[in-house]
Amino acid sequence: MNSFNEGVVSPLLSFWRRSLMLAGALLLTACSHNSSLPPFTASGFAEDQGAVRIWRKDSGDNVHLLAVFSPWRSGDTTTREYRWQGDNLTLININVYSKPPVNIRARFDDRGDLSFMQRESDGEKQQLSNDQIDLYRYRADQIRQISDALRQGRVVLRQGRWHAMEQTVTTCEGQTIKPDLDSQAIAHIERRQSRSSVDVSVAWLEAPEGSQLLLVANSDFCRWQPNEKTF
């Protein structure tokens, strides 16, 4: 999915890194304010190879997190679903939308011990090695820490359908708004829209220091965006 060019990616990477550094500092002092955070949040960030969108629901000590990786140019869209009970990781469910697609699934008991693991692709099922399990657990902890920082830093993901005439977006929640995006981001959306027969989907980040475009695509982001009640 070619959603960006270099001119847009570079400032976006700088933006999210500044936001994440600020959010990391906030984690050291803002623990007492956790109760003010909503239980269901959407956030995201840009990395060198693509964009990551994160949906998260906190319910008591339980955390349910979905991270969706969308490549800038080459590679496969990947979803990573995780569940925690307290500090214990209980579920890893990874789907790589390659040809053929790959599913990786692992479950852990209340003590954190592995109870099930499997990699499936093209009808073939394989067991995972201990090193692979350790790597997937490490990545789960990593995305959880990033999510913690983004929530504390109030970095919020918004997405929806673009309306070229008004330069507005109808969000997946049904609101029609005008994103506070810079001229470079608007120009990029307009270029993508000019090559599409349907309204393109856009995703952007809002933070206290400003807004930044994250993704533009022909596919409908709202068709699969998680819903708070069913997530």
Curated annotation (Swiss-Prot):
InterPro entries per record: DUF1481, UCP006993
A family per Pfam: DUF1481
Record-given protein name: Uncharacterized protein YjaH
Source organism (scientific name): Escherichia coli (strain K12)
